[in-house]
Curated annotation (Swiss-Prot):
This is UPF0102 protein APJL_1381. It comes from Actinobacillus pleuropneumoniae serotype 3 (strain JL03). PANTHER family: UPF0102 PROTEIN YRAN. HAMAP family: UPF0102. The lineage of its organism: Bacteria, Pseudomonadati, Pseudomonadota, Gammaproteobacteria, Pasteurellales. GO terms for molecular function: nucleic acid binding. It holds the Pfam family UPF0102. Signal peptide: none annotated. InterPro entries: Restrct_endonuc-II-like (IPR011335), tRNA_endonuc-like_dom_sf (IPR011856), UPF0102_YraN-like (IPR003509). Belongs to the UPF0102 family.
């Protein structure tokens, strides 16, 4: 039973990541990669807007009963996000957060509402 629930959560996550990707592409961003895993954390989507790498966290909540999707991005998650982005930049481009043009966006889905896009979330 637990394995089925996990697969369902994974497939739901993949579904919302695909929706976020399509939404961002309609808004002019170019897709680079998805689900980049590192020991320090994971990157849901990596996009590009002009010369800027955009690291996107995709969040989904059926309701905000236990807090909104955006509120679920706590300090610990933010640090993992930064660490994973730094690792990706180094391994793929021999750059770092200090040398690359980059930003951190959120695309949040709440219930049946349209996606909420927050550019430069860590701004």
């Amino acid at each position: 039973m637990a394995q089925w629930k996990t697969l369902t959560k994974r497939s739901q996550g993949a579904n919302f990541e695909q929706k976020a990707r399509e939404f961002l592409e309609r808004n002019g961003l170019k897709f680079i990669a998805a689900n980049q895993q590192f020991k320090c954390g994971e990157l849901d989507l990596i996009m590009r807007q002009g010369d800027t790498f955009v690291f996107v966290e995709v969040r989904q909540r059926k309701s905000n009963r236990f807090g909104s999707a955006v509120e679920s991005i706590d300090y610990r998650k933010q640090q993992k996000w930064l660490d994973a982005a730094n690792m990706w930049l180094f391994t793929r481009h021999k750059q770092s957060l200090d040398t690359a043009n980059c930003r951190f966006d959120v695309v949040a889905f709440e219930g049946n509402d349209p996606p909420l896009w927050i550019p430069n979330f860590l701004g």
